Amino acid sequence: GPGSIAGTYMEALKGSQTVKITAVLGHREESAKAFSEKYNIPYYLSTEQMYNVENPDAVLICTPTFTHGDIVKTAIDKGVHIMCEKPFVLSAETAQQLFDMAEEKNVRIMVMQVVRFWPEYLRIKQIIESGEAGEVTNVYANRLSAHPGWCSWHKDPQKSGGGLYDLHIHDIDYMYYLFGRVKNVYAVGRQTETGCWNNVSTIMNFECGIKAVIEGFMDITGEWSFSTNIRINSTKMAIEYLNKRVYNSKATKEKVENLVIYHKDREPEIAAVPQYNPYRAQTEYFADCVTENRPTDTVPCSDIVYILKILSAIEKSLETGLVQNIE
């Protein structure tokens, strides 16, 4: 797919010695040709022609969510390894079926949950798991965005899953990555006229005893720039990562991005976090796993199935107003 996220990967992979994008497949010639010319790679409008001519080792699926299933099935039939943008599909059952099909054909699949590779989020995980923070006492995160105006399918919950599956999934996934299995969830939100849950606030109750409040809004009014924030309080420190653009005194947008550690017994510090492109990191990670014949432990398929179960429970809580247990 020659869309915006595909362009993000193309920019990220410039100069990579591990991964080379050899072609783009699209369904509209105008966009496919423009992408082809921008990145100097051939384009195809025929799936069969692309596979026959290019004979790829892997495909990177950057198409609308509702198209993922059929594209994945075709790649499995061709014996081609698969990287797929999130959300993979919109149900745990469908995801499990596709993963089972891939396993039978010895095809690797990794869903691109990029937050697991994000430098600051990865540093937070390292701090928590090392015990440096002490006991975690409360957790809050948000991910806020105006609604994407560049497509119509995003407004159809049967095609996109709405903000719940497209945006909120990032922080739900990351919280599970940090704290493990979830006991139950409770959520409140606002549903659009078309049925999308684009405004969601979720309370996650983890089996380990930690509770987290997560907000995902894809309906912010006005010229709101995409922003993320996570705050973890613990017995030894408070940790906050903020990434947003704010208006300064000159009424121009100024980017604020830092990971601050507020120590209990000394002055706060801005954490030194080695910077790299997380989109490149996750793509090269998958390529290394395939070539070295090792599992994609950072994003196992079983995690994707579990996250989709959590999202389904959140959706049911939104609809019923009740706490939902996770199987």
Describe the predicted segments one by one.
Residues 9, 39-101:
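Beta-loop-alpha module in the N-terminal Rossmann-like domain of NAD(P)-dependent dehydrogenases
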Residues 115-194, 200-203, 321:
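Predominantly a Rossmann-like dinucleotide-binding segment in NAD(P)-dependent oxidoreductases
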Residues 1-39:
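N-terminal Rossmann-like dinucleotide-binding module
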Residues 58-63, 207, 287-327:
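C-terminal helix-rich "cap/oligomerization" subdomain common to oxidoreductases
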Residues 96-114, 134-139:
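Rossmann-fold dehydrogenase core element
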Residues 41, 78-80, 105-108, 209-211:
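A short helix->loop->beta-strand "cap" motif at the edges of active sites that frequently abuts
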Residues 45, 84, 109-111, 214, ...:
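Hydrophobic residues in well-ordered beta-strands that form the structural core
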Residues 172-250, 273-276, 280-295:
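Contiguous beta-strand/loop segments that form the cofactor/metal-binding neighborhood of enzyme cores
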